[in-house]
Amino acid sequence: VLRIAWFALVLAPAGAWAAVPHLFFSDLESGPNTGGESNAGAYVTVYGKDFGSARGSSYVTIGGGQAAAYPVWTDTKVTFQLGAAAATGDLIVVVPDGSSNAIPFTVSRGRIFFVSPGGSDRKNGGFSSPWRTLVKARDSMRPGDITYAMNGVAQTADDGSGWNTSLLVRNGGHPAAPKAIVAYPNATATIGSVNGPATGIRTAPAEGGHPDHWVIAGFVLRGQGAAMGLWGSNGWRIVGNDISCPQGDGAAGCFDTVESSALKFYGNHVHDTGKENASSQYHAVYFGTDSNHLDIGWNTIANVHGCRGIQIHSSPQSGEAHSGQNQYDIRIHDNVIHDTQCDGIILATVDPSKGPVTVYNNVIYNAGKGPDNPERTGGWSCIYVPGYTNSGSAGSGAVEIFDNTFYGCGTFAKPPYSDQNAALAFGGGSPDLFLRIRNNIIFQTATSLFPAGVPYLAIWNPSTRHVCAAADDCRWIQGSNNLFYGSGPPPANPNITGSVNADPEFVNVSQHDFHLLGGSPARRRGVDTVSAVDQDGVPRGGAEGTDLGAFQFTGQ
């Protein structure tokens, strides 16, 4: 119920929407169409919009064949069982008013197992003879296998591996045959504990192998320090989990990675992370050392103690001479991030010249609200790009920031130092790195420190080591077609053109509904970007033009 409720909140409409459904992502990308419950194969969950509040005559096709069963059907989430008619090909949701976009799915080989509180690890793990523990499942699975955790499954104690974790993972699947542990439809299943082991799920490479290519989906994940910590683990897919670490502290994150790449982090609710006086080095979501090829989308990250909502930061590891390089090929999109002690997002060590670094279709509000952490350090913005380099060559090229909505950024009124409160900030660490901003809405608010409104920008000149004035020819930020409101006129920097300076007319700011009203000056003021749809899946451009911010106006 928790997971369905928060996802519906993220996607809640602000009026009537187009009736044709839109798919965002699925938990599984492959699975068998036989075996498991009723010999009808794997259960798959898709997330999106406009599926309808009840199934009625709607259905799902996989490679042209209809699914066998539908235990969950809501407007934003559908769970179905593949069935014998499913084939490799396009996965499509069909409703009376039309068909969704397609996402690929592969019908593959693999076994299906079940874990239940009433099961026994001496049984065979079938639907009618389930195992009792996820440890048994972990130790028994082969590449391509799927285990479903039934309602009430709780792997909360230390698993006895010696790694201070509830579930240690040291082996893996293959790119075309991952291992998957998924919550059974409508089940609440838990891994980790806020008062138990340090980590809920922990990975560590073993001699002769790496814990690569896993799917973890639909769980309640908890940890005293981290709900999930990936080390040397590639190709993971973390989908639709409820993640929280209210006792977290230290140099870590409630979800964190080291030397782990090609990750998909989709549709998770990360909330209430860090204890009240947590360290500045503690973050909600932390993609760490040499973690590249990251796709971070459709998550809600909220109520963060310590410091950042999302931290991208690479630092050398002891005994690894070439570790800690700048990070690249990073997509952060379609997220809602709010109520963070420091920045909503920090892209600390990035190099877009090696692979794009893009931030788009996000809603970020009340980020950088303070108070001080014990170290009295941090930054207070919606997005901060320091330009650090801890190992290797400095970053260069453009960090692309487009089609986002930012509200109330950097409101901490008692920072320990100046020029770090803003909506967007650049630290000047590399003279060859810059921000390109397009189609964003930046709505700032007043504080006791900034009675005329918190600054829109804080862009440090790498040469002078001072913040650029609003009218400076400051080349470390460029772009066009942004709306600035709440802190006076827009920046006069000649590298920022086509700005709008007016109230964007959101539907309901007090309820954090940042959809646009029909008369909004943000309508039809954008330029084309690579973002074909908005955060709701509504197409951008065309006859209606491109609106500014994370949401396209839908006609009502």
Which residue ranges define each predicted feature?
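Predominantly extracellular beta-rich ligand-binding scaffolds that present long acidic/polar faces
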Residues: 157-165, 170, 334, 355-515
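Extracellular beta-strand/beta-solenoid scaffold signature
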Residues: 160-169, 193-207, 223-229, 247-258, ...
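Acidic Gly/Asp/Thr-rich repetitive segments characteristic of extracellular carbohydrate-active
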Residues: 115-151, 156, 162-163, 520, ...
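Right-handed parallel beta-helix/beta-solenoid
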Residues: 18-29, 95, 103-136, 151-155, ...
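Beta-strand/beta-sandwich contexts
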Residues: 17-57, 88, 97-113
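Right-handed parallel beta-helix
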Residues: 178, 182-187, 209-223, 234-247, ...
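Right-handed parallel beta-helix/beta-spiral solenoid domain characteristic of secreted/periplasmic
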Residues: 69-71, 155-161, 166-226, 247, ...
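C-terminal accessory segments
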Residues: 497-556
